[in-house]
Curated annotation (Swiss-Prot):
Organism: Eremothecium gossypii (strain ATCC 10895 / CBS 109.51 / FGSC 9923 / NRRL Y-1056)
InterPro entries: Lsm6/sSmF (IPR016487), LSM_dom_sf (IPR010920), Sm (IPR047575), Sm_dom_euk/arc (IPR001163)
Protein name as it appears in the record: U6 snRNA-associated Sm-like protein LSm6
Listed GO MF terms: RNA binding
Top-rank taxon, per record: Eukaryota
Subcellular location: Cytoplasm; Nucleus
Family of this protein: Belongs to the snRNP Sm proteins family. SmF/LSm6 subfamily.
Matches recorded under SMART domains: Sm
Disulfide bonds: none
A GO CC annotation given for this chain: P-body
Coarse class of the protein's main subcellular location: cytoplasm
PANTHER family: SMALL NUCLEAR RIBONUCLEOPROTEIN F SNRNP-F, U6 SNRNA-ASSOCIATED SM-LIKE PROTEIN LSM6
Length: 85
């Protein structure tokens, strides 16, 4: 197959997560809560630490429920997805 016909490069989830540390992210929980902040750290259990985070219900179009000036820790079992902003 020629290089022009190849699809996008596949990135492993661990590579993706290590590359977005220090960048702004959305973290959606199974409860429907959405957190936006800077990804400070993440571990193998998907436990997440954010700084300068805002908390929303369902989407960022809804009003901010709370803004956190210090760290926010989210338990990995509650995380539905993490996306880079």
């Amino acid at each position: 197959m020629s290089s022009a016909m190849q699809g996008p490069a596949v990135t492993s989830s661990s590579t993706f997560l290590s590359n977005i540390i220090g960048k702004p992210v959305n973290v959606k929980l199974h409860s429907g809560m959405l957190y936006q902040g800077t990804l400070e750290s993440i571990d193998g259990f998907m436990n997440v630490a954010l700084v300068d985070a805002s908390e929303y219900y369902e989407s960022e179009q809804n009003p901010v429920i709370h803004r956190y000036e210090s760290d926010v820790f989210l338990r990995g079992t509650q995380v539905m997805y993490i996306s880079e902003l």
